[in-house]
Curated annotation (Swiss-Prot):
It comes from Bacillus anthracis. GO terms for cellular component: cytoplasm. Pathway: Amino-sugar metabolism; N-acetylneuraminate degradation; D-fructose 6-phosphate from N-acetylneuraminate: step 5/5. One of its GO terms (molecular function) is identical protein binding. Catalyzes the reversible isomerization-deamination of glucosamine 6-phosphate (GlcN6P) to form fructose 6-phosphate (Fru6P) and ammonium ion. Disulfide bonds: none annotated. This is Glucosamine-6-phosphate deaminase. The keyword Plastid does not apply. It is an enzyme of class 3 (hydrolase). NCBIfam families: nagB, PRK00443.1-1. GO terms for biological process: carbohydrate metabolic process; glucosamine catabolic process; N-acetylglucosamine catabolic process; N-acetylneuraminate catabolic process.
Length: 262
């Protein structure tokens, strides 16, 4: 696991963008796994600013709320249109359909999309309880795309995006942990002290379904970009346990970057 420590959100955004740019430029028809929420906003802004050529890029999104219309400003369909899809010409874009009449069939359909479009680079944030996507503690590590009931802590964390608590959806469709782990490369970004406990578990905790992010300990090609606050609870020996890089150039010089992981 690579760890790149940054000082500011701007540095995180630039580093994340450079990693995406490398994949897009070196793969013939790349597939990017996209995340939503506040974590990737700076990265998406860099993609817009630099007018990244996404004409060969397919995207697959991690998740979507159930029963939230696509045109709702809090839906992830709307989020992706606003952040990227209305600004850059992608080859193809996929977001789970939380309005589907048969949600179980939608999950199967989305698994088929993932099988047909293997993810070259998956972007992830990390929840305060260690969730990735909407995969909460206790989710089986081999889970496929599925329907989940959102925990109260996750709903509270997302309340800031809604006018009132009762507007926050109770369920979502999410790529499963097993689906996420099929990505050839994973980029996880974390900023701020609120993520410190989860990042500590990710890097130093036991491999356990009690903290979904710890599954990444078994993935062969993970990069964590985090600030000092997010790493503040980690031991001083963390750089010895993982490969710490100090610039994005150091990271891109790693021969594994952009390669297919087994």
């Amino acid at each position: 696991m690579n760890i790149l420590v940054v000082k500011t959100p701007e540095e995180l955004a630039e580093a994340g963008y450079k990693l995406i740019e490398e994949v897009v430029k070196t793969k013939e028809n790349p597939t990017l796994g996209m995340a939503t929420g506040s974590s990737p906003l700076g990265i998406y802004a860099e993609m817009r600013k630099n007018k990244l050529d996404t004409s060969r890029v397919t995207t697959v999104n991690l998740d979507e709320y159930v029963n939230l219309p696509h045109e709702d400003k809090n839906s992830y369909h709307y989020f992706m249109q606003e952040q990227l899809f209305d600004h850059l010409p992608f080859k193809q874009t996929y977001v789970p359909n939380g309005m589907a009449s048969d949600l179980e069939e939608e999950c199967k359909r989305y698994e088929g999309i993932l099988a047909a479009n293997p993810v070259d680079l998956q972007i992830l944030g990390i929840g305060e309880n260690g969730h990735i996507g909407f995969n909460e503690p206790g989710t089986p590590f081999n889970s496929p795309t599925n329907i989940v009931e959102l925990t109260e802590s996750t709903r509270q964390a997302n309340l800031r995006f809604f006018e009132k608590e009762e507007d926050v959806p109770t369920h979502a469709i999410t790529m499963g942990i097993g689906s996420i782990m099929k990505a050839k490369q994973i980029l996880l970004v974390a900023m701020g002290s609120k993520k410190a406990e989860a990042v500590k578990e990710l890097l130093q905790g036991a491999y356990s379904e009690a903290c979904p992010a710890t599954v990444l300990q078994r993935h062969p090609n993970v990069t964590v970009i985090a600030d000092q606050e997010a790493l503040s609870l980690c031991s001083e020996a963390i750089a010895d346990e993982h490969r710490q890089v100090f610039t994005i150039s150091d990271l891109l010089s790693d021969s594994r970057v952009g390669e297919t992981a087994n």
